[in-house]
Amino acid sequence: MEDEFFGEKSFQHYCAEFIRHSQQIGDGWEWRTAKECSDGYMCKTQFRIKNEASTPHVGTPASVLTCLPTEENLELPMDDSEVTRPAAVAEVIKHEYHVLYSCSYQVPVLYFRASFLDGRPLALEDIWEGVHECYKPRLLQGPWDTITQQEHPILGQPFFVLHPCKTNEFMTAVLKNSQKINRNVNYITSWLSLVGPVVGLNLPLSYAKATSQSE
């Protein structure tokens, strides 16, 4: 594991390990390669129900936002008490997460976007409002510098991105700590576990267990 340099080959290696475990547990991550070049990226798509009677925001706790494996399962259960009053307005949000390698910063970068099923995208303000409350204090000093909209370097489409300027700093601390306790880590797993929850992307604990068992 490189302490000072995280090259693209290392990025692809750790992504491959990550995706192997994802396939074992059916978590939906896959690797895609651009047709015009050899560059590739890791990606996942998931659907959530947004209940507007409970919250107007995206990225709220799992009790409000329910992850859906497919587009078909979009109906909300209705009990007798709900029949006697107007049904809550529910909308389905499609979330796309892409993990790419940044040659400039030499670290992985999380690109993401969210849209309704009719294709209407969520605005940057909606994305920021959907950031979980426990992460907002850390980002409030510069939310628009932390979550920005950029062109996807491979797809050429607008995506939101978590700026990678601090990635090397906090990942160096993570890697040094893992060395002290002689623990094997997958760079992508450790990094995504830290940055993913900021935008509603959570990894099952089995990823960390799989990394430890691969020593």
From Swiss-Prot:
One GO term (biological process): protein transport
InterPro entries, sorted: Atg3/Atg10
Function: E2-like enzyme involved in autophagy. Acts as an E2-like enzyme that catalyzes the conjugation of ATG12 to ATG5. ATG12 conjugation to ATG5 is required for autophagy. Likely serves as an ATG5-recognition molecule. Not involved in ATG12 conjugation to ATG3. Plays a role in adenovirus-mediated cell lysis.
Gene Ontology MF terms in the entry: Atg12 conjugating enzyme activity; Atg12 transferase activity
Chief location bin: cytoplasm
Similarity comment: Belongs to the ATG10 family.
Oligomeric and partner information: Interacts with MAP1LC3A. By interacting with MAP1LC3A, it plays a role in the conjugation of ATG12 to ATG5. Also able to directly interact either with ATG5 or ATG7.
PANTHER family attached to this UniProt entry: UBIQUITIN-LIKE-CONJUGATING ENZYME ATG10 (PTHR14957:SF1)
Superkingdom classification of source: Eukaryota
One term under GO cellular component: cytosol
The enzyme's E.C. designation: 2.3.2.-
Pfam families found in the cross-reference section: Autophagy_act_C (PF03987)
Name of this protein: Ubiquitin-like-conjugating enzyme ATG10
Active site, renumbered: 165
Localisation per UniProt entry: Cytoplasm
Gene: Atg10
UniProt keyword annotations, A-Z: Autophagy, Cytoplasm, Protein transport, Transferase, Transport, Ubl conjugation pathway
